[in-house]
Amino acid sequence: MKTLLVVFFCYLPLLTLAGEDAVPDTETMPLANSVPFATAQLASTSTSISSPNPAELKIISLAPHLTEWAFSLGLGPNLVGVSDYSDYPEAAKNIQRVADFQGADIAAIVALEPDLILAWDGGNKPQDIHKLSSMGLNVFSSKVENITDIASEIKRLGALTSTQKKATQLSNDFLTDLNTLKNKYDGRPLKPVFYYSWTAPLMTIGPNAWGNKLLSICGAQTLFPDSPVDYPQVSIKDVLVRQPHALIAASKNSYQELDVFWREHRNFLDAPLVIVDPDVTSRFSLRLINELKSLCEGIK
């Protein structure tokens, strides 16, 4: 259980390692010996940097979703270092690990001599990002607060790495599918659902949590919209009293394993149990669209 909690609290965007006010200093130095193919603005700074030929670019990713973005843009071969839990696509599993929930391995990163470091503003430690950028390394700091930010951030990364055409295509496809889903479920009263990841302790999501933003696409909302915190601990009684329209388990466990917990309460609760993949719903990934379709279908 301790291991599961560590993974959840350190790598799901539902909870961040850095506070909202902890904005890293992302000012960077120009890339050495680079060819000026493309430029992009880095977060929290007005500094523009030029990227070298993409074929020669050495990239390090400090978050699993950033690793996925790089592969989506055809930059998988350029990755020389990634964070723990960078497990998609399969090829990502074979790349050297240079960061985990404790932080970035600065020495290992420097030794790899990267041209570009992809950092997660809100997930990576601000002091690590500041340290790397202060050493003259180029840091692309990405911040995602809403689902549509995934598309805009991928376009920003594409502009920086001379993969604009691919990034624009991916971004447009993502937004088209997202808007189709939103339009399908828009305009109806929000259905209350109980979204959880485990049962010991039984925890759910508040109104401002990432999971609730996913639910809103499906015309639903957390069963606890009045929660003052993003990830409240609740009791079975709380759930039964509020009578959710559906139970959403973000879990790798089977339906049979998850249903055992609710079985003794079925005389008072007839909400269907829907399972979503936490590796997808918790990441700012392009794969999120297909998982959202399954989520919405289960709730309707």
Where are these regions (language model features)?
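Short helices/loops that flank or line small-molecule/ion binding pockets
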Residues: 106-113, 135, 234-243
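Basic- and aromatic-lined ligand-binding clefts that recognize polyanionic substrates
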Residues: 52, 57-70, 165-218
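A short, structured surface patch at a secondary-structure boundary
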Residues: 57-112, 116-123, 128, 223
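Flexible loop/hinge segments that line or gate small-molecule binding clefts
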Residues: 126-156
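Bacterial N-terminal signal peptides
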Residues: 6-15
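Positively charged n-region of N-terminal signal peptides that target proteins for export
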Residues: 1-5
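Structured C-terminal subdomain patch of bacterial secreted/periplasmic proteins
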Residues: 104, 148-159, 168, 172, ...
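His/Asp/Glu-enriched short active-site or ligand-binding loop at hydrolase and phosphoryl-transfer sites
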Residues: 83, 208-231, 274-275
